[in-house]
Regions:
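Active-site signature of alpha/beta-hydrolase-fold catalytic machinery across serine-
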Residues: 56, 85, 89
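Walker A/P-loop
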Residues: 66-86
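N-terminal pre-P-loop "Q-motif" helix
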Residues: 44-67
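SF2 helicase/translocase NTPase motor core
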Residues: 4-46, 67, 80, 91-213
Length: 213
């Protein structure tokens, strides 16, 4: 992507990546290819060098330090593919990752990013109500996934278990904001979050006094 790092962060960024490579005893490219079950060629097709570094350090943080990671790249660097790669990683490791974003139209964006990295087969369970704005569309505008009908959706919320037909979860922050008056969705997300991977898009907009994220 031919990106640059601010001078004030360049040394620290380089050292952080180098420390991870020393700890894992391999370079980040090899490490990420192994964790995402890619050949070296397919990894290069799916992720740029910058994205590989981000994914590698995120996976290292999860597996070794039991911590998360914040991706603070500017627009155009490809944070969506990093998020998609982490969803792929979670699914490959027996989890049902939870993707949370600010607006439902971003469900389509994450699906397209998953498509770009060769993971369009991963099936989302949409927490939001079934309506046109929550539909997931491919690059041609065709609807490929929709939220379940309300009766089936509510059944899943109540049993707090994801059926085998789904691989990961999509929700907006607004679905988590009514835990007092409408607790069923927040309770479901809370139950599903245990020992799981959360991918929080636009997470800086999830905090504050607003109840809508």
């Amino acid at each position: 992507l031919d990106t640059v790092v601010p001078d004030s962060m360049g040394y620290e960024t380089h050292i952080a990546a180098r420390i991870v490579e020393i700890k894992i005893n391999k370079d980040l490219h090899e490490y990420v290819a192994e964790k995402l079950k890619y050949s070296s060629f397919d990894l290069c097709k799916s992720l740029s060098a910058e994205q590989v570094d981000a994914v590698g350090m995120a996976i290292y943080n999860i597996e070794v330090k039991k911590q998360g990671m914040i991706i603070g790249d500017q627009t155009g660097i490809g944070k969506g593919r990093v998020a998609a790669a982490m969803i792929r990683y979670g699914c490959l490791n027996g989890m049902h990752p939870i993707f949370i974003s600010e607006k439902p139209n971003l469900f389509t964006d994450i699906y397209r990013d998953l498509t770009d990295i060769g993971s369009s087969d991963l099936r989302p369970f949409i927490v939001n109500a079934k309506e046109s704005k929550t539909d997931i569309k491919d690059f041609d505008g065709n609807i490929v996934y929709q939220a379940p009908d309300k009766v089936y959706q509510d059944t899943i919320f109540k049993i707090k278990k994801l059926p085998a037909e789904y691989d990961f979860i999509c929700s907006t922050y607004s679905q988590l904001s009514s835990s007092d008056t409408k607790p069923i969705k927040p309770a479901f997300i809370l139950a599903m979050a245990k020992d799981n991977l959360l991918v929080m898009d636009e997470s800086h907009n999830a905090s504050g006094s607003s109840k809508t994220g």
